[in-house]
Design a protein with these regions (language model features):
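Multi-pass membrane proteins that catalyze or facilitate reactions on polyprenyl-/lipid-phosphate substrates
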Residues: 169-193, 310, 324-326, 336-340, ...
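Oxyanion/phosphate-interacting regions
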Residues: 2-107, 115, 275-295, 314-325, ...
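Residue-level signal for inorganic ion chemistry
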Residues: 106, 110, 138, 149, ...
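DPxDG-like acidic metal-binding loop motif
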Residues: 207-211, 222-296, 303
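N-terminal capping segment at the start of a domain
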Residues: 104, 108-132
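N-terminal assembly/interaction segments in proteins that build large macromolecular machines
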Residues: 123-225
Length: 467
């Protein structure tokens, strides 16, 4: 679903790909300077091969969207190569436009931080109360996305529920950590014009970064609208150099209305999902991707009622984001036979019962080995058609959080799939930060028929399980 324009003024004429139109633009010039100097100074010898994407300007089916006005936060670049999006403007168009740009920026930030974690040290890693890891990227992404949403939509109009808080960063002995987060945020925001967003007039200070993080204090609920953000979903995968995701969803009156899922390490070749991402990095270094190839990394997005989900590559190198950034539609698989299906489950046994899902897989005739993937990348795999089933049955006492599922659920649904609890009921995002009333676990499938077969098998197997 190529993103569409929230507004178009009619003052300055332009010719776009043979199509005459008019628009008022605000041009923002990007200055020079290093990006992520905090890390680049100590990692100058570590080359990171990232595929870049060349736009096929001769492809008449590509449509580029302009969102511009005299007071717009967006940038219109290279207008001679742009034509209008074919998608009709609709509800939540502006919000989706901003959300995708914000997630693109967040993924760009994460790639830099992950490279430094893999290359040098884990000193940037902290532990939360539940012993799950949290990194500079978690806080930096949360601050960056919070700042972007507040600046573009107005702070009074933005409520965010998110995973991280400022308790650790606010401690007296965390001055070095806070300084690193502030620098990472500012380095990222300085690149905002490349993503079609306005950079801050001056660098943010520590208090402003802490405020942006702490602004994510919504408690959710059944009324009004709020954003659900998981800045780095699958932090363990992130620090291990494997799969992780940046997830952002808008929830209105208890219903998810748009979702954006950034998957920086998602390989474009399905078979690579079966390998730890370090093998992918090794191969990329041995045979670097060409400028025409799209090797890894994507953002998948949708909005409620569109009946479609779209995927675009991450922008690489020093390229600028130009809508729709070679976006392509994604659809779930048509496989209905469990014997032919690929089954996803969490990597960590602490997050889900592998023994129950293994027994269930055997009972329905699943022949393939389960695909164990960190984070909401599992939702992306189903939406893309690379897998057909995702089941998660948490151990007793564990409560699912809405930011771990909201974006992935709507993306699968609009791509043609089905997501419910084990009782066949839709997931309820109206009860605050947790998915309250969840019947046993979560089942996501590529289609209704396959979903029905799996839920029946769960019912048949549940009583014999010690879960």
């Amino acid at each position: 679903m190529p993103l569409n324009c929230s507004s178009l003024a009619t003052k300055v004429p332009h010719t776009l790909g043979g199509l005459k139109t008019t628009a008022t633009t605000t041009t923002i010039h990007v200055g020079g300077g290093g990006f992520f100097n905090l890390f680049s100074k100590t990692h100058q010898n570590n080359s990171l091969y990232i595929a870049s994407l060349s736009l096929n300007k001769r492809n008449s089916s590509q449509r580029y969207c302009l969102s511009s006005s005299s007071s717009s936060s967006f940038v219109m670049e290279d207008t001679k190569d742009m034509v209008f999006s074919t998608l009709e403007p609709g509800k939540y168009s502006k919000e989706l436009d901003i959300a995708v740009r914000a997630v693109q920026m967040a993924c760009f930030l994460c790639q830099k931080v992950q490279e430094s974690l893999i290359s040098k040290t884990t000193s940037q890693l902290q532990a939360k109360d539940d012993n799950s890891p949290v990194t500079i990227a978690d806080w930096s992404v949360q601050a960056t996305v919070s700042w972007i949403l507040s600046e573009t939509l107005g702070s009074r109009n933005v409520a965010i529920i998110a995973e991280e808080d400022v308790q650790t960063l606010s401690k007296a002995d965390s001055a070095g950590l806070l300084e690193a987060v502030v620098q990472t945020v500012n380095d990222c925001l300085a690149e905002a014009p490349r993503f079609g967003l306005k950079a801050p007039g001056t660098s943010l200070g520590s208090s402003e970064v802490l405020e942006a993080i702490s602004r994510c204090n919504s408690t959710g609920g059944p009324n009004g609208r709020f954003w659900a953000l998981d800045p780095v979903d699958g932090t363990l995968g992130f620090v291990r150099g494997d799969q992780y995701a940046v997830a952002l969803a808008l929830i209105e009156d208890g219903e998810v209305v748009l979702g954006v899922l950034g998957c920086p390490n998602y390989p474009m070749r399905k078979e690579w999902l079966s390998y730890h991402h370090r093998y992918h990095r090794i191969i990329s270094k041995l045979t670097p991707p060409t400028s025409e190839s799209w090797d890894k990394g994507c953002v998948i997005y949708t909005r409620r009622g569109s009946g479609e989900a779209w995927m675009q590559p991450l922008i690489q190198g020093h390229k600028k984001l130009v809508w729709p950034n070679s976006a392509t539609p994604v659809k779930v698989s048509t496989i209905e036979n469990p014997a032919l299906a690929t089954f996803c489950e969490p990597v960590e046994k602490a997050n889900s019962s592998h023994s129950f899902t293994a027994g269930l897989a055997h009972s329905v005739g699943l022949r393939k080995q389960p695909l164990r993937v960190y984070s909401m990348v599992k939702y992306a795999a189903i939406a893309r058609g690379d897998a057909e089933i995702f089941m998660k049955f948490a151990r007793a006492g564990y409560k699912e959080k809405i930011w771990d599922h909201a974006a992935g659920v709507i993306i699968i649904q609009e791509a043609g799939g089905v997501v419910t609890d084990a009782g066949g009921r839709p997931l309820d995002f109206s009860k605050g930060m947790y998915l309250e009333g969840l019947d046993r676990g979560i089942i996501a499938c590529a289609g209704a028929k396959l979903h029905e077969k799996i839920t029946r098998a769960v019912d048949a197997s549940w009583n014999s399980s010690s879960l």
